[in-house]
Amino acid sequence: MLPRSLKLIKKVGESNGLRNFGSQSNSYTLPDLPYDYGALSPVISPEIMTLHHKKHHQTYVNNLNIALDKLSSASSAKDVAQMIALQSAIKFNGGGHVNHSIFWTNLAPKNQDGGVAPSGPLADAINKQYGSIEKLIEKMSAETTAIQGSGWGWLGYDKANDRLVIQTQQNQDPLSVSGYVPLLGIDVWEHAYYLDYKNVRADYVKNIWQIVNWKNVAERYNTAKK
């Protein structure tokens, strides 16, 4: 039986193309970026993108594989105490893998429609619930910037109540642990912005909207609504 933390990560992982969650193989790999490391400059520098993707995300993948290998051994040995002890590592590193895999696709270079406002059902939902895209951005920016320590700001979909939600998560906790479908995430761990923005997180959050891939967010929304 899968621990609760792995079940939650498996669910959101499968919804984002990470099909080997819960398979017999525990070998997860770093996804390719859909653009070059320098494509998001000057909002995010090539140096940050390279470190963030090749070092930080890769570390989450490596540590997730290690934790799942240990879980497999503990399960075979029927070592329930060890299985329970591994849940925090699986949640943290699995969450880091899932969160970043979404994050990369949530962004796009300006010459590939990065920052272009959404249209269609997502735009209608935003206007109905928040009044305008500008008001959504203002609210989500304020809540994301105010996160204490490390974490993520999310725009999600609440299937039970058919509504959008703005939710912050600490550390690498995936949005799925709050019961929502992730649509758009903003990483506010310092490794995501410090080399470019130093300690001025607000400037990073303000500028990242210039490269949000609203087409990707809209596709996630349409899929979640089905």
UniProtKB/Swiss-Prot annotation:
- What does the UniProt keyword field contain? Manganese, Metal-binding, Mitochondrion, Oxidoreductase, Transit peptide
Q: Name one GO cellular component term.
A: mitochondrion
Q: In its keyword annotation, does this UniProt entry include Protease?
A: no
Q: Which PROSITE patterns match?
A: SOD_MN
Q: EC annotation?
A: 1.15.1.1
Show the Pfam families listed in the entry.
Sod_Fe_C, Sod_Fe_N
Q: How is the cofactor bound?
A: Binds 1 Mn(2+) ion per subunit.
**What are its GO biological-process terms?**
superoxide metabolic process
Cofactor(s) named in the record: Mn(2+)
Q: Which domain of life is it from?
A: Eukaryota
Gene Ontology terms, MF aspect: manganese ion binding; superoxide dismutase activity
Query: Binding positions for Mn(2+)?
Result: H52, H100, D187, H191
List locations, semicolon-separated: Mitochondrion matrix
Grouped into one coarse class, the protein's main location is mitochondrion
> What is the recorded function of this protein according to its Swiss-Prot or TrEMBL entry?
Destroys superoxide anion radicals which are normally produced within the cells and which are toxic to biological systems.
What this protein is called in its record is Superoxide dismutase [Mn], mitochondrial
The uppermost taxa in this organism's lineage are: Eukaryota, Amoebozoa, Evosea, Eumycetozoa, Dictyostelia
